[in-house]
A protein has these predicted regions:
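Conserved acidic, metal-coordinating active-site core of Asp-based
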Residues: 98-200, 207
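Active-site metal-binding loops of divalent metal-dependent hydrolases
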Residues: 9-11, 43, 188-190
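Short active-site oxyanion
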Residues: 34-38, 58-60, 181-184, 198-202
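Asp-based, Mg2+/Mn2+-dependent phosphohydrolase catalytic module
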Residues: 180, 198-231
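Asp-based phosphoryl-transfer active-site loop
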Residues: 2-19, 39, 197
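Short, structured coil segments at secondary-structure junctions
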Residues: 55-58, 66, 143, 198-200, ...
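Active-site phosphate-binding/coordination module
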Residues: 19-108, 112
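Hydrophobic beta-strand scaffold residues
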Residues: 13, 37, 102-103, 149, ...
């Protein structure tokens, strides 16, 4: 039976240059057996493709911006979810952008744009840690009807439409590939990985956020290559 493996990128597939080479080799063998490998990252298209080119990465599907956009291995767009334009102005105000260390927005065409553009797929804002946690809590409480907000590494918050997440994006791919649910495996380390870890055969990295470690039920690995050996 075919299997699907979905991996986060930062602090999961990539820990260091030595680790990523082992992971690449394991994924190559995994795919040779007609299995499906998917990256599910919070990175924008531009940011991920820079790493893909640097490390010569291969995949069958790519989920970017925490699930906002899904592409196949030929970069054809399968789905794209945008933040409701009507709430962006209010979100910008509550983000207190003037206090952000840096910020940027993404849409389908651009990985670095601003609030003036419409059809944004992701908003990124970096702060001091306490401020980032405060903003993350506020956005999730006030705009839960419209968006998902994640606290990410580097003391930043990232906002996407609540119509999607990594887990939902995986489900779209499953509907295309018709793989049995028990043969779908996921691995990650951060807050935006929680749903896909809960909803599939989820594993987490040793240095995952506490909330993720709590739901992994001891299914913890040191690397993607170790997980591939297990499955």
């Amino acid at each position: 039976m075919r299997k699907i493996l979905v991996s986060d990128y930062d602090q999961t597939f990539y820990l260091n240059d030595e680790d990523i080479e082992k992971n690449k080799k394991s994924v190559e063998n995994f795919r040779k057996q007609e299995n499906i490998f998917i990256f599910a990252t919070g990175r924008s298209y531009f940011d991920f493709m820079n790493k893909a080119e640097q490390y010569k990465l291969k995949w069958d599907y790519l989920i970017i911006n925490h699930g906002a956009t899904i592409l196949d291995k030929n970069n054809n767009i399968i789905s794209n979810y945008t933040i409701d334009n009507d709430v962006i102005k209010n979100i910008k105000k509550d983000l207190e952008i003037e206090e952000a260390i840096k910020y940027f927005c993404c849409n389908l065409e651009n990985s670095r744009t601003n609030f003036n553009d419409k059809d944004l797929t992701k908003i990124h804002a970096k702060y001091e840690k306490n401020k980032a946690e405060q903003i993350n809590s506020l956005i999730n409480k006030k705009y839960a009807e419209f968006v998902n907000c994640y606290f990410v590494s580097g003391n930043a918050v990232e906002i996407i439409s609540n119509k999607t997440c990594k887990s939902n994006a995986i489900e779209e791919i499953v509907q295309i590939e018709k793989v049995n649910r028990e043969n779908i495996f996921t691995i990650g380390d951060g807050y935006s990985d929680i749903e896909m870890i809960k909803n599939y055969n989820g594993y987490c990295m040793e240095k995952s956020v506490q909330e993720l470690l709590k739901i992994c039920n001891g299914k913890i690995v040191k690397s993607v290559s170790e997980l591939i050996e297990k499955i």
